[in-house]
Every structure is written in C-alpha cells, then in structure tokens.
C-alpha cells in the first residue's frame, strides 16, 4: 500500500484543478495539465481512503453522490441521490456511536451552499442551517420533517438504538446507520430550483422541461455535484469548456470560477446558455426542431463535433444528411452509432426525463 499523503495539502490542490472534454471541445495546454493533475490527485485521494477504510470501501463524491469525511477521515456521510438513501458510517475505534450521532445531526441539518463545504478534506465545515437542504426529504420516526437541532438529535438517538449495523472490512469494524429519503425526494429537490429554471428558460428560449431533464440526468438535483472530470454543480458545467464558451459569448474574459458554478442560479444560467449555444449556433444547420433537440442533448454530453462527425466530417454536409432524415432515424443513429456509450445512453435518459416533465 502506498504511504498516506498529507491530505491537508492535497485538498487545496484538488480544489484548484479542473478538466474535461465534456460539454464543449475547447482545447489548450493548460487545460490538459489541469486534467492530468486532477486525475492524479483524485487517484491519490482514493488510495488514502482505501488505506483507512479498506478494499472496496472507497467512497468519493460524484454527480449524484454527496460524500463528506470528518474525524480525520474516520467518519463519513453519504447521500445517494439516485437511490434516495443517506448512509452515515464510522471506523472510529473509540465511541463510534458518538461520532455517528454528530455526523447524523450535521447531515440532516446541513444547508445547500456547496461553496462552504470541502468534500476533499476532513475539515468539519458543515454548517447547521435554519433552512436544511434535506428538509422535507427526510421524515423522522414520527413522520415529521426535520428543521431544528432538537428534533435531529432525537431522531439520531432513535436511529442509533434501532438501526445501528456493523461489518468488518478485514482491518476495522465499520459502524453504520442508513436513512431513507421520502419516495418523492427527486421532485422535492427539483421544486427548489423551479424559479431559477423558469428565469433561465425565458432568458435563453430553452424549454423548461429540457433544462429540468438535463439537471435530473446530470446531478439528480444535487447542488454539491462534482465529477471525475471536474464538472460542477446542478448542470455539471466544466469551467474550461462549456463555461469558457458561455463567458466568451457574453463578452466576458476567462472562465467561471468554481464558486460561480456551485451557485445554483449561476450554474443553471450557464448550463442553459450553453444549451442555447448548441441549438442556435453549433447545431443551427439542423432544420427539424425535434432532430435538432436530439442533437443538442447528445452534444451537451459529448460535444457538437462528435455528433456531426457521426454523419460526416464536413459540418455542412453532416447537417444536410440529418435534414434528409426523419427525427426517428436521427434518434436511432445517435443512440446506436455515437462512439461514446455514455452519450448514447445520455440521449435516451434525457429524452425520457423530458417527456415526464412535459406531462406535468
């Protein structure tokens, strides 16, 4: 096993890095260096967690997974926004239930400001909020939502008495408690951002249902969303590609900061602006609105160039080929012939989600 690295040093380096070919195809040397550096540091971070927690016990924050370590990385809270579960675990050798109790309370009462929490360190920077992010998404044992510390404490004590589990990782005993979110947790999170979505929809002329479908597919409405490619926030915008393109189109220099993209309103605005760019600029040669929507969705994931190259290396000829096809044929080709399996699945997922939002 590799020696433990100084995580206090790694954490700020992680925060300064960014990368991805996703959602845009801008390329420069600095961006490549950032990509390589981020990948290396994430690998080191994962190795450190494995050294402490054991093989197959590595958990790192992702687009649909909030993971926060505390207590010198001995305690962690994991919210799986896809499955709708919260799992709080500890490998603390002394008073494990006390560590779990504190982490449960903090998780239930945390706010929704990703800029205040460092997901790559063990700093206990989770602030108790008067408007908890999980309010209404979790009900206590009496069926009540949890807003105040007293109710959260009582519920934590109940959980430790009735749902405490343990398992061995071969090195240590892992103590855990799992909490289920309410069945409609996805809708409750989506509702928080409806006003921002409507504003961005009117500003850029992008259908609300498409914005919501992208958000659901990208992050499951997790404002803390990060990815291995360093895509950030609700719509998983990458600073050096889509973010830079949008800033340039708005007459701004540079790239959006991490804090900017972790702000829900700014993230939704930037992601929606990029959808509009794909529709009105990069893929504007596609005449049928349904065919163009399929292309835009796929391009949001894998880039406009990769979409057009499926049909022809010449952009104009590619658009002409698409224009001679029915929307159904375009959909079939994008979901079967795109070189990226992720992009092929992405169109299916977003299109299905958009249909469900249109019916509401």
Swiss-Prot record:
One of its GO terms (cellular component) is cell outer membrane. GO terms for biological process: cell wall macromolecule catabolic process; cell wall organization; peptidoglycan metabolic process. One of its GO terms (molecular function) is peptidoglycan lytic transglycosylase activity. Keywords: Cell outer membrane, Cell wall biogenesis/degradation, Lipoprotein, Lyase, Membrane, Palmitate, Signal. It catalyses: Exolytic cleavage of the (1->4)-beta-glycosidic linkage between N-acetylmuramic acid (MurNAc) and N-acetylglucosamine (GlcNAc) residues in peptidoglycan, from either the reducing or the non-reducing ends of the peptidoglycan chains, with concomitant formation of a 1,6-anhydrobond in the MurNAc residue. The keyword Lipoprotein applies. Residues 1-16 form the signal peptide. It is an enzyme of class 4 (lyase). The keyword Lyase applies. A lipid is attached at residue 17 (N-palmitoyl cysteine). It is a lipid-anchor. A lipid is attached at residue 17 (S-diacylglycerol cysteine). It is found in: Cell outer membrane. InterPro entries: Lysozyme-like_dom_sf (IPR023346), Murein_transglycosylaseC (IPR023664), Murein_transglycosylaseC_N (IPR024570), Transglyc_AS (IPR000189), Transglycosylase_SLT_dom_1 (IPR008258). Its EC number is 4.2.2.n1. Coiled coil: none annotated. PANTHER family: MEMBRANE-BOUND LYTIC MUREIN TRANSGLYCOSYLASE C, SOLUBLE LYTIC MUREIN TRANSGLYCOSYLASE-RELATED. Murein-degrading enzyme. May play a role in recycling of muropeptides during cell elongation and/or cell division. NCBIfam families: PRK11671.1 (NF008670). Belongs to the transglycosylase Slt family. This is Membrane-bound lytic murein transglycosylase C. It comes from Salmonella typhi.
């Amino acid at each position: 096993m590799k020696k433990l690295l100084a995580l206090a040093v790694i954490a700020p380096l992680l925060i300064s890095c960014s990368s991805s070919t996703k959602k845009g195809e801008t390329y420069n040397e600095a961006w490549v260096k950032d990509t390589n550096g981020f990948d290396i540091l994430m690998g080191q971070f994962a190795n450190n967690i494995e050294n402490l927690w054991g093989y197959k016990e590595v958990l790192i924050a992702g687009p649909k997974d909030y993971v926060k370590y505390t207590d010198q990385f001995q305690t962690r809270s994991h919210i799986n926004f896809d499955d709708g579960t919260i799992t709080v675990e500890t490998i603390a050798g002394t008073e494990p239930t006390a560590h779990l109790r504190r982490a449960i309370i903090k998780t239930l009462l945390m706010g929704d400001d990703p800029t205040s929490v460092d997901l790559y360190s063990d700093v206990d920077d989770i602030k108790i909020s008067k408007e908890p992010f999980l309010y209404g998404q979790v009900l206590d044992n009496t069926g009540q939502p949890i807003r105040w510390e007293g109710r959260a404490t009582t519920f934590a004590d109940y959980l430790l008495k009735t749902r405490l589990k343990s398992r061995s990782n071969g090195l240590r005993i892992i103590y855990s408690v799992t909490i289920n979110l309410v069945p409609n947790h996805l809708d409750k999170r989506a509702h928080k951002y409806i006003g921002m979505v409507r504003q961005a929809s009117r500003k850029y002329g992008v259908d609300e249902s498409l914005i919501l479908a992208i958000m659901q597919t990208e992050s499951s409405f997790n404002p803390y969303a990060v990815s291995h490619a360093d895509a950030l926030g609700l719509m998983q915008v990458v600073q050096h590609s889509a973010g830079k393109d949008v800033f340039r189109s708005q007459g701004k220099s540079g790239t959006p900061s991490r804090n900017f993209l972790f702000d829900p309103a700014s993230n939704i605005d930037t992601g929606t602006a990029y959808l509009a760019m794909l529709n009105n600029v990069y893929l504007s040669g596609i005449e049928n609105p349904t065919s163009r929507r399929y292309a835009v969705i796929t391009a949001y994931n894998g880039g406009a160039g990769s979409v057009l190259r499926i049909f022809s290396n010449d952009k104009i000829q590619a658009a002409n080929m698409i224009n001679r096809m029915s929307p159904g044929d375009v959909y079939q080709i994008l979901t079967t012939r795109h070189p990226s399996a992720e992009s092929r699945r992405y169109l299916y997922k977003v299109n299905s989600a958009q249909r469900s939002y249109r019916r509401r």
